[in-house]
A protein has these predicted regions:
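Short, charged surface segments at domain edges that flank catalytic/cofactor-binding sites
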Residues: 1-17, 47-53
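Residue-level signal for well-ordered alpha-helical segments
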Residues: 3-11, 32-43, 59, 71
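Histidine-centered nuclease catalytic patch
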Residues: 19-55
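Short C-terminal domain-edge/linker segments immediately following a structured domain
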Residues: 50-51, 58-61, 87-93
């Protein structure tokens, strides 16, 4: 799964298959390095603007579950690749639960 660059309006939803749970639903953009930490010196020094803006389109339930489990700094340091997000056991359990849910 290749990280994407946001298009003109990253907050706009688009439909497709969520890479985390596999459901066909409206998708939202998740920054792999959360925007809240973009101004911190460590991240400005080690990452260029293009890398800071990479992310994944995923469903709202998966996206919310990620942010409920981990704070922005942890996400930026430890979960800044799609592979790291999908390999985490706690997130895997959440994604499996979301996959069993019906879309309202």
């Amino acid at each position: 799964m290749e990280p994407l660059q946001p298009t003109h309006n990253i907050r706009s939803r688009r439909s497709g298959q969520c890479p985390c749970c596999g459901r066909e639903v409206a998708l939202t953009f998740h920054h792999l390095i959360p925007r809240k930490v973009h101004r911190r010196p460590r991240f400005r020094k080690h990452y260029d603007r293009e890398t800071l803006n990479k992310g994944l389109f995923m469903c709202r339930r998966c996206h919310s579950g990620i942010h409920k489990r981990y704070d922005e700094l942890t996400l930026a340091k430890d979960f800044n690749t799609p592979e790291a997000l999908l390999a985490d056991p706690d997130l895997q359990r959440h994604f499996a639960w979301v996959a069993r849910q019906r879309e309202r």
